[in-house]
Every structure is written in structure tokens, then in C-alpha cells.
A protein has these predicted regions:
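Nucleic-acid endonuclease domains
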Residues: 1-43, 48-485
Length: 485
């Protein structure tokens, strides 16, 4: 009806608008947040979600997590996973993907391009069940306030409220909490989306005995694989794993160690062998979006590595809406006032919301030996995401008020974006070796070319930048694994 069309147009800013339109117009649904599956007869749950098009790979990729069902903090948890509302909704999903084309003037122009009837595999259900158990362990211990996006391997939790109003007193006690829902991680949603393309060859599995997941969580299993090697010199690990012959110091990644012991024993191979894998490409890591990173510390507990996240699109940040308040409809159909900054629609948020690192930590001791210190499976917590948001807002402020470029006495070009010393956890710096700058009048300088640049809002161009995790931030994450002399 005209009235319904007018209502839809008034909700243009609502992040969930495309999904609500599909569910209401195509399936005739009223907005609901029922605990039962949407199609009760066949036990299927309907989900509509965004996908972005990656020009580099010429493929669609998942644009967000999928919220499966709300966590009811006011009631006792269901300890039997198979009797839970989560399993009821998760066992069969109808997932509709639409292309989130940010170049279009309206969300109403987004195009639906793929629908999938998806059943999680037995292996996936085993890991999700383990995630569910670990999340509920926190809730039952009165620690619901410690739940975070970093929980879980395939299944996580995410806050439902945009502001801390209507806080809930949990059934099991502890601090009051905001609404949260069980969510499927973005990389797992990519597994569903991969059905749009030719099916890929399966990778090897880290977990071959699913009963392991009845005894411990995925993170504990990973740590268990590494635990026998903690405190070992790297050469003892190499010998035990039977990785012999010659390798240059630079190829190995340890410039200070003597040459001469290994065959095909690059760090990824050493790490994979400790895990019992042939390579670091395994099904569990792919589906959870786990990236393995080796971190080196000197005897004083200092690391040099800064981890690159992805390239920066200055115009995407600049064009994000200015901070403002607007009305949005929640999953219960109620309107609430929310504070919008454009952050949750940004490329950086999309990366950080899905990223999960397996940090493999080595440290040089007083004798100069390289010791394996342990591992940590880590994802950004809600608090970390908030720090990153503040860094992103600082970058946006520079773009809004003007990027300043200055040529120093050393001939290098400096800018006024916050540096690693000012940033909380994320800073900008170039990824490539080439630098190039173009003024609005067409004059240019640098040792690169136009393809090494990104446009600025005022018509100039500057060397392409990337987001990087601060080395001090990484140090804070793994500080319990290292020693400081």
C-alpha cells in the first residue's frame, strides 16, 4: 500500500531495512522475534543478509554476521543444546543474500542475487555446540557481562542494543547487561555464500575426533596441540618434527639464528606440524576466519611486528554520515532512538568484527636461543572494537577538516593522520614501497605512480594507506605468554 511504501521510505537509514522488506513483502511476514523457527512445518529459519562485491577476487563476500536468536538472560539457560531455541533455528536456514552496493542512492535499489537452503554439517554442529556450552558456562557463572564478540569459534554473541538503556538483570546474578544475541560469525556466513560458486575442494580437518569437543572447547583443543612444545628451543621442535636440511636465515624468518638445519621448515610448516596439520589451510580455520600470525619478541619483551588489516578507502570514511541521532526499529518491532556514526557500516568494522587471530609466540632468551612461548586464539572484544571506533573517528576527523601534507628535511612526505604513538590500537601507514602524491592542480611528486594512490576528498591524491594493528596492542594481547628481563 502507499502507506507501507511511505513507511519504508522513512526508514532508509535503518540498517536492517533490506531484510525487513524481503521478509514482509515476499514472504508476507510481520516483524517478529519469536523463539521458534520461521517455517515451523519444515523447521527452517529465514535470514536475509548483506554481501559485498570484492573487486580484487571478483567474488561476493559476506558483509555481516547473522543474528540467529536472542539470548534470554532473564531465564535459566537450556543446557541441552539440541533442546535449545538456538538449535531449533540453526538446524536449517533459508539465507537470502542481497548485494550491498554502496554506490546506489537508496537501499531500496539493492538486488537480491542468491538464496540458499543450508544445513550445518555434523562437524559444524559439534563446534557450534561446544561454543554454546562455553557461552552458557559464563552466563551460569554470573558472568554474562563478560560476554563478547570474541567468544566462540563459529558461534559468537553480539549486543542487540545500540545504547546502554533498559539494562537487564541476569537470572544468574552478576552485573546488569545489555541485550545480546547468538550470531554466526561473518566468515562462517561466507561458507553459506560459497554455494553461489562452484564448490571448493574440502581442506583437511584439525579435529578428526568430534568427541574431543565434548570434553573441551575449540580454543582448548588448539592450545592442547601446542602445549607439549611450550618452552622448547625451536631447533628441538624442528628435530622432533623431523624437519631437516638447509634453510637460509632470512627464509626462516629468524635473521639471528645459525643456518643449516631444516628442509621445507618455514614457520608456517613448523606451526602446522605442531598442530598435526600438513598446512595451515584447514576447514576449521577457514570457516572461523582464523588467521595464523607468528609474533617474535626480544629478550626485553619487545616486538616489532605490526599486522596489516587492509587498504584504506578515504572516500568511504569521508562519506560516512556525520554522528547523529535517529529512530530505528528493533527486532521486536519497537522504535528506539539510536546514535549513528557510520562506524558499523564501515569496511574497517566489517574486518574487525570477523577477524580471529591465532598468535604463535616465540621469544629470544638470554642465551640467544629462540623459545616457543605458547599460543593464543584471539578476537576483538567489544572494548577493543570501541577503541578501534575511536581511532576510525579520529581518521574521519582529519579527512573532514583536511589532510595536511608536508615534505620534511629528509625528503619524506608527512601527514597529520594519528601515528602509531597516538592511536589506541589501529593506525595508518603505507603498505607498499612506492610513494606518490598529486595536488589538485595536477602537480605531483614521489617515486611511484598514480596507481599507488587513493583520492582525497579535496581532489588531491596521496599514497595508498593500510590499517595496521599497533605492535603495542599485539604485545598487550599476548603479554601473559612472554617474559621481560
Amino acid at each position: 500500500t502507499e502507506e507501507e511504501i511511505d513507511w519504508v521510505r522513512s526508514k532508509e537509514a535503518d540498517k536492517g531495512l533490506p531484510g525487513k522488506i524481503v521478509e514482509a513483502s515476499y514472504f508476507g511476514y510481520e516483524l517478529n522475534n519469536r523463539q521458534e523457527a520461521d517455517f515451523e512445518t519444515v523447521g527452517a529459519e529465514l535470514k536475509t543478509t548483506a554481501a559485498d562485491y570484492d573487486e580484487a577476487t571478483a567474488r561476493y563476500k559476506s558483509g555481516e554476521t547473522i543474528s540467529v536468536t536472542q539470548i534470554d538472560f532473564r531465564r535459566p539457560v537450556e543446557t541441552d543444546f539440541y533442546a535449545s531455541h538456538l538449535y531449533d533455528k540453526l538446524r536449517m536456514l533459508i539465507v537470502i543474500f542481497y548485494h550491498r552496493d554502496r554506490t546506489l542512492a537508496s537501499k531500496l535499489l539493492y538486488r537480491v542475487f542468491f538464496a540458499s537452503l543450508f544445513r550445518p554439517s555434523e562437524e559444524d554442529i559439534a563446534i557450534i555446540k561446544s561454543d554454546y556450552r562455553e557461552i552458557n558456562r559464563k552466563i551460569r557463572a554470573g558472568q554474562a557481562n563478560t560476554l563478547s564478540r570474541s567468544d566462540g569459534t563459529y558461534l559468537s554473541t553480539a549486543p542487540k542494543a545500540k545504547k546502554r538503556t533498559n539494562m537487564i538483570t541476569p537470572y544468574y546474578g552478576g552485573e546488569r547487561v545489555v541485550k545480546r544475541s547468538y550470531t554466526l560469525r561473518k566468515e562462517y556466513v561466507n561458507v553459506i555464500l560459497s554455494g553461489y560458486y562452484t564448490r571448493r575442494e574440502p581442506e583437511e580437518h584439525l579435529i578428526t575426533d568430534l568427541h574431543e569437543l565434548d570434553r573441551m572447547g575449540f580454543a582448548q583443543i588448539v592450545q592442547g596441540r601446542f602445549s607439549q612444545y611450550v618452552g622448547w628451543d625451536i631447533w628441538d621442535i624442528v628435530g622432533t618434527l623431523n624437519l631437516h636440511a638447509e634453510q637460509t636465515r632470512d627464509e626462516l624468518g629468524f635473521p639471528d639464528i645459525p643456518v643449516g638445519v631444516m628442509n621445507k621448515a618455514t614457520l608456517p610448516v613448523i606451526t602446522a606440524r605442531m598442530l598435526g596439520l600438513r598446512s595451515l589451510k584447514c576447514e576449521e580455520f577457514t570457516r572461523a576466519g582464523i588467521i595464523v600470525k607468528t609474533v617474535f619478541f626480544n629478550r626485553h619483551g619487545i616486538n616489532k611486528e605490526k599486522f596489516r588489516l587492509g587498504d584504506v578507502d578515504f572516500m568511504e570514511i569521508y562519506n560516512a554520515p556525520a554522528p547523529h541521532t535517529e529512530m530505528e526499529t528493533d527486532d521486536d518491532g519497537n522504535e528506539e532512538e539510536v546514535y549513528q556514526t557510520g562506524w558499523e557500516e564501515s569496511e574497517l568494522f566489517a574486518q574487525l568484527d570477523s577477524i580471529k587471530y591465532l598468535f604463535v609466540v616465540f621469544q629470544k632468551d638470554a642465551d640467544g636461543d629462540i623459545i616457543f612461548m605458547g599460543s593464543k586464539l584471539w578476537a576483538m572484544s567489544d572494548e577493543d572494537i570501541e577503541e578501534a571506533r575511536q581511532d576510525w573517528m579520529d581518521i574521519k576527523s582529519v579527512l573532514t577538516h583536511g589532510v595536511q601534507l608536508r615534505i620534511g628535511n629528509d625528503g619524506r612526505t608527512y601527514n597529520n593522520f594519528p601515528g602509531v604513538a597516538e592511536a589506541r590500537c589501529i593506525h595508518l601507514r603505507p603498505h607498499g614501497a612506492k610513494a606518490f602524491y598529486v595536488n589538485a592542480d595536477g602537480t605531483s611528486w614521489g617515486n611511484g605512480c598514480i596507481s599507488d594512490t587513493e583520492p582525497l576528498p579535496d581532489g588531491r591524491r596521496m599514497t595508498r594507506q593500510s590499517y595496521w594493528l599497533n605492535n603495542s596492542f599485539v604485545r598487550k594481547v599476548v603479554r601473559d605468554l612472554i617474559t621481560v628481563e
